[in-house]
Amino acid sequence: MTLVSDDAIADRLYRDNYKTIRQYVDILVSRGVDWGLIGPREIGRLWERHILNSIALESLIPEGCRVADVGSGAGLPGIPLAILRPDLEMTLIEPMLRRSNFLTEALDELGLDDRVTVVRGRAEDADLHVDVVVSRAVAKLATLINWTADLIVESGSLLALKGQSADDEVVKAKKELSKRRLSAEVLLIRADPAADVTRAVRVRRAGK
């Protein structure tokens, strides 16, 4: 746990956009729970476990990138990143109709529908090329690599938020990594020095 409250950290990070991220959290607490996208037990730890966890990836994403959030669900990590980083061209990819409808409505309410796009479908079927793919609680690393390899440009990367299983998943993805000539590294990152550590796996072309 942090010594500074997690919403206070978010306030400091988001600055002028704090009102928007606060509105998004309110949407998660209300409609996100009602629609079954967020568990009721998560309400008390939304800032720590979901918002700050998501935006820990921000430091790994270069300015002005095209980013795809694969299996976006309730919009994590894509929406918190898009609010924090208006320079990003964000696409939320979600195969389930109910979830994609939630995303569309949320983006409209947040005023983000002009720069964040929702694509309903599977990542492997998307007609899209991006610099960075992000994902959170979607699938094992080997599966993610298989789903997203054709989405990412040659110089791009996959950033997958993972928990304690990160190192084990990298080992188990060895065959997929080798076949596609990719390298993977586990990174310990924070949204802020006062925030908790987040584990992410970064996958790139070998030698990049």
Swiss-Prot record:
Write out the residues that bind S-adenosyl-L-methionine: G71, L76, A123, E124, R136
Principal localization reads: cytoplasm
The protein's superkingdom reads Bacteria
> What keywords is this UniProt entry annotated with?
Cytoplasm, Methyltransferase, rRNA processing, S-adenosyl-L-methionine, Transferase
> Which residues belong to the signal peptide in this entry?
none
**EC number from the UniProt entry:** 2.1.1.-
Which InterPro entries does this chain map to? rRNA_ssu_MeTfrase_G (IPR003682), SAM-dependent_MTases_sf (IPR029063)
Q: Name one GO molecular function term.
A: rRNA (guanine-N7-)-methyltransferase activity
The terms describing its cellular component in GO are: cytosol
What Pfam families does this protein map onto?
GidB
Q: Which compartments is it annotated to reside in?
A: Cytoplasm
Q: What does the similarity note say?
A: Belongs to the methyltransferase superfamily. RNA methyltransferase RsmG family.
Q: Which PANTHER family match?
A: S-ADENOSYL-L-METHIONINE-DEPENDENT METHYLTRANSFERASES SUPERFAMILY PROTEIN (PTHR31760:SF0)
User: What is the role of the protein in this entry?
Assistant: Specifically methylates the N7 position of guanine in position 518 of 16S rRNA.
Give the protein's recorded name: Ribosomal RNA small subunit methyltransferase G
Could you tell me which species this protein originates from? Cutibacterium acnes (strain DSM 16379 / KPA171202) (Propionibacterium acnes)
